[in-house]
Amino acid sequence: ASQSLAELMARVQQEQSRLSDHQYLGLTDIQGLVGEGELFDTLYVFENYPVAADITGTSGDLRVTSVEGRDAAHYPVSLAVLPGQTLRLQLGHDTGLFDEATAQRMVERLRRVIEEMVAGPEARIGGVDVLEPAERERLLVEYNDTTRPVPDGTLPQLFEAQVARTPDAVAVAYGDTSVSYGELNARANRLARVLVKRGVGPERLVGLALPRSVDMVVAVLAVLKAGGAYLPIDPDYPGERIAFMLQDADPVCVLTVAETDHAVAEAGVPCSRIEDLYNAAEAGFVASDDLAGRERLGCLRTNSPAYVIYTSGSTGRPKGVSVTHSGLASMGAMHADRFGVGPDSRVLQFASPSFDASVWELVMALLSGAALVVADRDRLLPGQALAELVAAAG
């Protein structure tokens, strides 16, 4: 970057002269010497070949003003330099990889660099600007204008504020079942109080080995309201991975249903069926209003963990990643703004609960007053079933 343009051109000229003894070595031979892989994907050609004088000369009243030819190159980008009375540059491109607008931008950037080289050959390479001022403004300012106000409050506070705005609106739709914001909030409050009595609070984890259902959404909200962070567990994961996650995360307990008990049975952690917790809440006449801060085992803050998700482990052992309330709320607000999600929207819970995207879908919907559409996994496979689901859900 500290080298001048003149020094760069001199160095390139010297290198080309040094390599000229090998200019007739075929590409096949070079490929064999280098090994596998593409040698290059951009072709540069300087068409410095002679043109017969009788073609360009004058014969009577007939005068040839220019001679040119066209050929095709099997590379994504090719640049041909055509000498003559004026120097011409011709850019070719694979239309399957680059559209006309992209190719035109390449030409404009090249023109700008050449003009800067001619105007100031002593300028440093690092000072050469390939972007037009308008394009630089667009890339560095407009596209980078991603700052948004972070919603002020924990996820329970933000959700409860939405409940107050739209208590009767549909919050979750699953098959023929629809649950309003008010009812979803009440269910989550009752379950949260049961979880608090079982030791769930800030900085404590609760595993969720639950299928796609309304119960899954209730459980997520209940853990957050209790002050804890949830750990999604895909029951279809290999037993070894599930056991590792649970032993590493050390949750207070794991919430299951009958069909997912087997997935966590060998991990040696306390398990509770969610229906049993519902029954305990009903038998104990547990209140359904929002939890007060004093009911929790500790202080819930915006920087408290909201959930923990494990990496794939493709580069080693899986690692647990903790995401805070403020981080998740900010992400949800950004997605809602980007996709125009509001009270009249319906958001499909498409991603697996064990992937980050599922959390974004849930938060984006429930903090915006939209309806979260939950469906069984077999209806989410590409094909007719998914198309029918999307059409029916609106």
Name each region found by the language model.
Residues A1-E68, T95-D99, E122-I125, G201-R204, ...:
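His-Asp-centered acyl/peptidyl-transfer active-site segments
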Residues A80-G84:
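Short beta-strand micro-motifs enriched in acidic
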Residues Q349, L381-G394:
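Conserved adenylate-forming
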Residues Q3, Q23, H74, T86-V128, ...:
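Carrier-protein-dependent adenylate-forming modules in NRPS/ANL systems
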Residues E36-E38, R70-H74, A164:
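A short catalytic or substrate-binding loop motif that flags glycine-/basic-rich loops and adjacent residues
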Residues L367-L372, A392-A393:
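Gly/Ser/Thr-rich phosphate-binding loop
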